[in-house]
Amino acid sequence: WVIHFARLIGLPLVVVARPGLGTINHTLLTLHAARSAGLHVAAVVINRYPGDAAPFDPSVAANPAQIGLRGKVDRVVLVTDEPDNDVEEATLAPAAETIIAQVPWAQIAGL
């Protein structure tokens, strides 16, 4: 249903992915489905990306580059996992707001 909704509103897609193991497969499948439906994918956002203090995970470290390369996506945005991000309160930590503000959303939407 998301594909039908995306086609209806006519805006480029921004795919949001998780950072962990398996995300390359899930994201590439999503990109394939979107493109097969004739939709333009403008960016992939990897949400809750671990910060510097998080334990090192080689799969997480490799995911952004592999998604960009194998998914043929020019823009892969990392939004770090911050304690002040709260979905229920609809709040973002200043670091996350800064990252999101750097993306040219109007340009992506073709406005």
Briefly describe each language-model feature range.
Residues 1-19:
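Inter-motif core of Ras-like GTPase G domains
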